[in-house]
Amino acid sequence: MHWLADYWWVVLIILVGMILNGIKELRRLDHKKFLSNKPEIPPHRDNNAQWDDDDDWPDKDKKK
């Protein structure tokens, strides 16, 4: 970890470069074009549908 104390500025320059490249790529993104050609999202599949009908709670109106 001694090298990190000596070269902390190199790590900082790399991080700043990564952030700037990310900002540049986000500026190139055309969100209006994406929203106009947005694909249809398939309906959500409920994986717990088979257990939804099972009622684990006791029935309050049921008499013993």
From Swiss-Prot:
Task: Read off the InterPro entries from this record.
Answer: UPF0370
> Which residues are connected by disulfide bridges in this protein?
none
Superkingdom in the source lineage:
Bacteria
Supply one GO CC term from the record.
plasma membrane
- List where the protein spans the membrane: 3-23
Q: According to the UniProt record, where is the region Disordered?
A: 36-64
What Pfam families does the database record attribute to this sequence? Answer: UPF0370 (PF13980)
Tell me what topology the record assigns in the membrane: Single-pass membrane protein
Subcellular compartments: Cell membrane
- Keywords assigned by UniProt? Cell membrane, Membrane, Transmembrane, Transmembrane helix
Principal cellular location given in the protein's record:
membrane
Q: What is this protein called?
A: UPF0370 protein YE1145
Query: What organism is the protein native to?
Result: Yersinia enterocolitica serotype O:8 / biotype 1B (strain NCTC 13174 / 8081)
